[in-house]
C-alpha cells in the first residue's frame, strides 16, 4: 500500500501569497508544516529532510523553494485556503497510508475510531492544538459527500476575506483615503483614527493596536536580548533595533528627504521630518479644532483645555504644561547656555534666541512693515513699530494715566512713583532706576573715554558730552 509523503500534505506559497499573511499567520504556517513533518516521522515513515523543512526551521522565507511540480496558475489570490480540501474518504485513506504494515500493533489502529459517523467526523491532529483541538467536518464546505475538512480551518473561517490579495488596492479608509491590498491591513489602520488598542500587556498594562507589537513588547519584561552589537556589546530584543543601532557606529544615513536633501538613519524619522514640508496636519483637537502634525503636540495641547500642568520646578515651584517649556525654564536656575554663536562666541539658553541673534551678523530683516516698508530682524520690534502708525499706546500707568507703546517703558516709568532704584553701582553704592543710567554712571569709575572728538582729539566718557564739546569748534552751531 502506497505511503502518504510529505509532498502530499505540504502547502506552497508564492511571494505574493506569502505577503498576504501577517506575522502571526506566517508563524502559524511554520508551526503546522513542521508539525506535519514530525507526525510523519513519528509514525515511522522514512523520509529525507526536505528543503522546505530546513528553511522553516531556520525561519527563512519558504516561497522560493519547490516541493514538487505544480500546474501553472494565474497569480494574485491566496487560493490555498479554498483549494486544499480533503474529503472524508480521502482523510480515511490518507490515515491508512500513514500506517504501513507492522505498525498496527503499535497503537495506530485506533486512528480510524476517532471518526464516529460520516456526518460528524473528527480528525485528531495531535500537535495542531494551536489551531484547533479537532476539525469538525460539519462546519466545512460541502464537496462530493457534502462533508470535507479544510487543512487550515483557522484561516478558512475567520480570516478568509481578510487575507484576500489582489493587484489593486481595493480596501480604502473612509477617514483619510489611504488604500490597502488586504482587508486586515485596513482594519489595523483604522485603529490609528479610533485610538483602539485591543492588545494589553498583562505585566504592565500597556496597550497596543497590533498583536505583533505586543509580542515584541513582552521581551522587555523577559529581558531577552538575542541581538548583540559586536562594536559596543549592547543587546537588543529585536534585530531591526540592532540594525538601526549599527548606523550610530557607521554613520550611515540611508533615508534622504527629496525636498531638502537632509539624511536620516531611520525611515520613521524621515517620515516625521516630511511633515515639515507638508501642510497636512493629521491630529485634530476635538475641543477647539486646532490641528497638529504630531500626536505628541496634540497631547500637550490638550493639557491647555484640561488646565493640566504636570511639570513642576523644584527650585521656584513654577509649573508648566509641556516638558519642553519646563526644560527651557530650568536653564534659568542652572545658567546653562547650550546654544553658541559660531560668529562671535556668544551663548544662549534657547535655540530661538540664537536664531534671532544670528540676524545681527547676517543683516537679515525678515519682518517688514506693510505701511512704510521698514524692515526689522525681530517680530516683536515690528509689532512695536506698527503702533507708530496706529497711534496706539496700550500700556497705561495706573498712577498717572500716562501711556506707552512698549511695556518696558511703562515698567521703568512706574519706578518714578515707587521710588524704586534696583540698579546699584558696586563701586560707590549709588542706585539708579534704569540699567542704562547705571551703565553711564560706571564710566565715571573707569579711565575709558570711548567718545573722541575728531577735530581736537579730546575724549569723553559719555556720548552726551561730545555734542556739547563740538559746539566750541562750530561757534555754538551744531
UniProtKB/Swiss-Prot annotation:
Gene3D superfamilies: 6.10.140.140, Classic Zinc Finger (3.30.160.60). CDD domains: KRAB_A-box. Keywords: DNA-binding, Metal-binding, Nucleus, Repeat, Transcription, Transcription regulation, Zinc, Zinc-finger. Its main location: nucleus. A zinc finger (C2H2-type) spans 171-193, 199-221, 227-249, 255-277, 283-305, 311-333, 339-361, 367-389, 395-417, 423-445, 451-473. It comes from the Eukaryota. Residues 4-75 form the KRAB domain. InterPro entries: KRAB (IPR001909), KRAB_dom_sf (IPR036051), Znf_C2H2_sf (IPR036236), Znf_C2H2_type (IPR013087). SMART domains: KRAB (SM00349), ZnF_C2H2 (SM00355). It is found in: Nucleus. One of its GO terms (biological process) is regulation of DNA-templated transcription. GO terms for molecular function: DNA-binding transcription factor activity, RNA polymerase II-specific; RNA polymerase II cis-regulatory region sequence-specific DNA binding; zinc ion binding. One of its GO terms (cellular component) is nucleus. May be involved in transcriptional regulation. This is Zinc finger protein 718. It comes from Homo sapiens.
